[in-house]
């Protein structure tokens, strides 16, 4: 596997020099400063590419040892997901961004089709047994937010009486500070998210999906794929759709990339090597019914990007992000399956350790949730060792 790390641009507390010291050679990043829906110009792409691939970001200096390997992500505009407003132009802009990236030698694009929120957590500093901090999604906390803070119309019909009682108890035990923090965690956006909302704005945004059910959102995704995949294929670009996180409906919104069946449908909608997926074990792994090694073995030829992460589930559907080799994901079997695919195809797929615990000296620093340096360094080192051990034993 090609070892990569995510970098959020010049304002990321983890610098490119830091990343170079981890042993990673690939950078996963995006042009976060460009508004959703606008074309990524060749000038902007080259500017970022030089910043990554040359020492001190100076084109006159030698290579830095890092390569911009994967784009994560070109955001899909909400109008495209809803097929409203200026969606036709936004699709054309997306195609142009793909063409421009290809001209600059960047040939892998991760993206998602999650409506409104990119990914959701209720606790950004959940303390685990060893004292490090992880990200957590608590189903009762989320229900408390939806029912009693957001007060989304119709939400009460989507929870059982038992769930509503647990949510009420959770809410009543919260302090005013707890409520503000929970709201911020969900609405203020996590790293990589492109939008942040107030409660009022969020309710309006959600209401735009009142008449878009799961099948309608799937149809809109399939239309998008039929438009962009031929362009990507013609330019040698590999698209890699990221699964829903968490992989089940929330906030009354449909989810369309949560299971192996979803993957099969979307890949069949526009058959091409360029219409592939991101194997995110942390997202798919939240569902016990997702066979992660099986998905890799059955669909590895369309696996264009890899996020390796583990979660620890409970019986209610809550989870926290476990250490990379712990939790519910059988990382040994997943990595073994990936290496089998690479051997079969004579390929080297880009992989990043997805998230990491905030630990050691990073506990004293301001970090992007999930993206502190030391936790990801630990994850990358563990995964590198696992890969070496499996390779030597094959």
Swiss-Prot record:
Catalytic activity entry: D-mannonate = 2-dehydro-3-deoxy-D-gluconate + H2O
Gene3D superfamilies, A to Z: Divalent-metal-dependent TIM barrel enzymes
Enzyme class label: lyase
Requisite cofactors: Fe(2+); Mn(2+)
Keyword set includes Transferase: no
InterPro entries from the UniProt entry: Man_deHydtase (IPR004628), Xyl_isomerase-like_sf (IPR036237)
Function: Catalyzes the dehydration of D-mannonate.
Protein name: Mannonate dehydratase
Molecular function as annotated in GO: ferrous iron binding; manganese ion binding; mannonate dehydratase activity
Involved pathway(s): Carbohydrate metabolism; pentose and glucuronate interconversion
Family, per entry: Belongs to the mannonate dehydratase family.
Organism of derivation: Flavobacterium johnsoniae (strain ATCC 17061 / DSM 2064 / JCM 8514 / BCRC 14874 / CCUG 350202 / NBRC 14942 / NCIMB 11054 / UW101) (Cytophaga johnsonae)
Keyword vocabulary terms for this entry: Iron, Lyase, Manganese
Keyword Lyase assigned: yes
Superkingdom field: Bacteria
EC number: 4.2.1.8
A biological-process GO annotation: D-glucuronate catabolic process
């Amino acid at each position: 596997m090609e070892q990569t790390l995510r970098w959020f641009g010049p304002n990321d507390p983890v610098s490119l020099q830091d990343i170079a010291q981890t042993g990673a050679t690939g950078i996963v990043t995006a042009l976060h400063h460009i508004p959703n829906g606008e074309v990524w110009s060749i000038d902007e792409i080259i500017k970022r590419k030089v910043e990554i691939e040359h020492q001190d970001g100076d084109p006159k200096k030698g290579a830095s040892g890092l390569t911009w390997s994967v784009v994560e992500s070109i955001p899909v505009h909400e109008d495209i997901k809803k097929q409203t407003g200026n969606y036709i132009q936004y699709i054309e802009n997306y195609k142009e961004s793909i063409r421009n990236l290809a001209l600059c030698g960047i040939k892998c694009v991760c993206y998602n089709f999650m409506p409104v929120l990119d990914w959701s957590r209720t606790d950004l500093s959940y303390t685990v047994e060893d004292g490090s901090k992880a990200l957590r999604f608590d189903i009762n906390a989320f229900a408390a937010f939806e029912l009693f803070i957001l007060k989304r119309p119709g939400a009460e019909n989507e929870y059982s009486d038992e769930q509503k009682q647990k949510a009420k108890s959770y809410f009543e035990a919260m302090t005013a500070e707890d409520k503000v923090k929970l709201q911020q965690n969900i609405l203020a956006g996590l790293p990589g998210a492109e939008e942040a909302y107030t409660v009022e704005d969020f309710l309006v945004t959600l209401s735009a999906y009142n008449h878009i059910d799961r099948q309608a959102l799937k149809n809109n995704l399939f239309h998008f794929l039929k438009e962009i995949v031929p362009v990507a294929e013609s330019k040698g670009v590999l698209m890699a759709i990221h699964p829903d996180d968490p992989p089940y409906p929330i906030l009354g919104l449909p989810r369309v990339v949560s299971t192996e069946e979803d993957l099969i449908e979307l890949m069949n909608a526009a058959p091409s090597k360029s219409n592939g997926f991101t194997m995110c074990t942390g997202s798919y792994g939240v569902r016990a019914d997702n066979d992660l090694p099986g998905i890799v073995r059955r669909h590895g030829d369309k696996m264009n990007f890899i996020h390796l992460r583990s979660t620890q589930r409970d019986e209610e559907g809550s989870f926290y992000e476990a250490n990379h080799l712990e939790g519910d994901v059988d990382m040994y079997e997943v990595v073994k399956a990936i290496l089998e695919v690479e051997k079969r195809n004579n390929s080297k797929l880009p992989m990043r350790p997805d998230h990491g615990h905030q630990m050691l000296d990073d506990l004293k620093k301001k970090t992007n949730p999930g993206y502190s340096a030391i936790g990801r360094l630990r994850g990358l080192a563990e995964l590198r060792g696992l890969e070496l051990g499996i390779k030597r034993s094959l």
